């Protein structure tokens, strides 16, 4: 048994987690890829030509638009992924990949983007997104997923966190320590431009990203806002905010680069585990208005590369958006973003993987029933920068 395999939850689109995984595959270019689902078109051909093994769910013709319907099947499918006889497995997980069954004697290192948010720290959000009759079934499903996570956490040899808030959640929910390796940003592809007067929102249009908060704050500040992204909230947002926002949908990389470079600022209204878009905007020399918690508080220097405001405060967000952003130095901002470059990520990731001991895992502390109860896991904890 020899060699190394790379595992990711599912490769259906090319967002932050998938771009991070793409950078991981460059560190080990000959390693096979194992994933629950794969869409070459949706991932813009980024993984074309690689040896990719998928789960049996691939036969169902699942896409980004309907894959959530298979949520109850993903844990079992993850456990049954055909890994092969490799002595090292590196998974990239936001929910399922860390639960794979590794070959006997293999070492499993998991790069964790976040514990599955709807099973842990955002249960209330998940319940609000389904009708009342379905909520008991969803509660049961999430309880089963927490049990799945706890079993997985006993088998993973080493977790790596993408930021302080993820590290805290890994320790609180699963009783594991995790070094931090910040996700990569392809900073070289961005350039500064002549800023316009609009602010920009970039992200999946789902409730936990709070696009409505960004639009309302921009309207209160008298700012134009352009919204990049698609998702289940798109129709609702268009109906509610007609004339208050310009919805651009999904855009290609070149268009996104231009939008970043010409924006007055990027607005990030929610708490992110890392917040890739915040670093991308800074790489383009644009300041970021975000929440003083989570990943954005780790990547944005208040007053120098952006402005940080309290969580959930629309008025504070609007007040920040009234700022004259031309006072920020685009050169200093883009230089700051280079500390999150792809090269820095890849070097650090390789160092951590190579340093992992093959000694049996020992829990850092016991996980009590109270810590895994719905009341406990629904509570949010600020990051310790």
Whereabouts are the PLM-identified features?
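Active-site donor-binding segments of glycosyltransferases and PAPS-dependent sulfotransferases
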Residues: 30-98
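Membrane-proximal helix-turn-helix segments that form the acceptor-binding/catalytic region
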Residues: 127-159, 167
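Conserved donor-binding/catalytic core segment of Leloir-type glycosyltransferases
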Residues: 187, 191-228
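Nucleotide-activated donor-binding/catalytic signature segment of Leloir-type glycosyltransferases, i.e.
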Residues: 235-255
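Acidic donor-binding loop of glycosyltransferase active sites
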Residues: 261-273, 286
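Short hydrophobic beta-strand element within catalytic cores of glycosyltransferases
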Residues: 287-292, 300
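A charged, aromatic-enriched C-terminal amphipathic alpha-helix characteristic of glycosyltransferases
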Residues: 325-367, 371
